């Protein structure tokens, strides 16, 4: 079920890696520009079969690192609603759509991936790599 957290680094249906994710749940509260509400669910979408499944919030979906000091994320002003979650252990990243503040906006994984393409470039410029290919061949 979608409410169960899948703690493994691959799709529960076909075993492929996730290519993008999104946050769902309550809107985040803000304190000096940072999220302080840790509520909401982190959902990932499989790169092969497109199954959406719930993932652990503080964990690299690829190497399963859980040390918060090795996990981080960044955003840019030019791509509101998107985060890039990076792992310093395996140097991978995954983009996460966070539309909780955009009333009525829904995550559509393939379109989210295309719309946030500049974030792939930013992550790769910082020497992070994408594990699962995008719909667009990147």
Regions found by a protein language model. Give the residues of each.
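Short flanking/linker segments adjacent to small metal-binding domains or redox-active Cys/His motifs
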Residues: 100, 133-138
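Cys/His-clustered metal-coordination modules, chiefly Zn-binding fingers
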Residues: 1-123, 128
